[in-house]
Amino acid sequence: MEKVIQELKEREVGKVLANEPLANHTTMKIGGPADVLVIPSSVDAVKDIMDVIKKYDVKWTVIGRGSNLLVLDEGIRGVVIKLGAGLDHLELEGEQVTVGGGYSVVRLATSLSKKGLSGLEFAAGIPGSVGGAVYMNAGAHGSDMSEILVKAHILFEDGTIEWLTNEQMDFSYRTSVLQKKRPGVCLEAVLQLEQKDKESIVQQMQSNKDYRKNTQPYSSPCAGSIFRNPLPNHAGNLVEKAGLKGYQIGGAKISEMHGNFIVNAGGASAKDVLDLIDHVKKTIREKYEIDMHTEVEIIGGNR
């Protein structure tokens, strides 16, 4: 990897770190090392990074702000591209905004609310990046990204980059085309908003923030929701009904506040979290004959 690191630095693509612990880059504070972590300084820098990756034929992975993510203890081989400060541009034109994939969803929602632009109220308090939100069709309070996305600039698994329309994104509940059909990540997005009364937008945002603060354990290291809701049921309710709130394996613990959250109670490993996830799946299956599926992305090791 020395030649890869050297060329990435020569091309001045952004920050380049060798053998970087990914626990430093996830909201759960868990994860082994990346062979190389690159934080690109722009979309053009991403293109340069991909040129180097193709030249040396190395594996690559993209992460955002580290929420909704569990990195395995073995870490990630090859190059990890972290969409962060270099991809947090914001351009507003009327009721339409073009925003970088590394931009904070919370920061974007707050900024737009102050301008009286409606459409992202549901995102108040949601951790993570715009790119990640598009990738998983993040949502809350009956709304999601599919309702406001016009198009997205996508870096595909084969290294090509192109724009996809809302229809081409093939959104459904907490999924998009990027997860399986056409694996890729969102570098930037164009969102359609609507001008409304600023005060009512701000009030709704605050209400959503308060709800999250009072019902979800974001003061503790966690990844966000662990399981998708097996509709019409709610994952958190099933976990609570099964008596699993507070259940702990190693340093990983099911939150006392919300059954669909696993917190790092101190020194948790990814294995602790995986074992706890398996225990929940097995228990819910035995008690209610319902299969639970993870919402959190699990990456690293041989995955």
Curated annotation (Swiss-Prot):
GO terms for MF: FAD binding; flavin adenine dinucleotide binding; UDP-N-acetylmuramate dehydrogenase activity
Gene Ontology cellular component terms for the protein in this record: cytosol
Residue numbers annotated as active site: 174, 225 (proton donor), 295
InterPro entries xref list: FAD-bd_PCMH, FAD-bd_PCMH-like_sf, FAD-bd_PCMH_sub1, FAD-bd_PCMH_sub2, MurB, MurB_C, MurB_C_sf, Oxid_FAD_bind_N
Protein name from the UniProt record: UDP-N-acetylenolpyruvoylglucosamine reductase
Organism: Bacillus subtilis (strain 168)
Location within or outside the cell: Cytoplasm
Database matches in Gene3D superfamilies: 3.30.465.10, UDP-N-acetylenolpyruvoylglucosamine reductase, C-terminal domain (3.90.78.10), Uridine Diphospho-n-acetylenolpyruvylglucosamine Reductase, domain 2 (3.30.43.10)
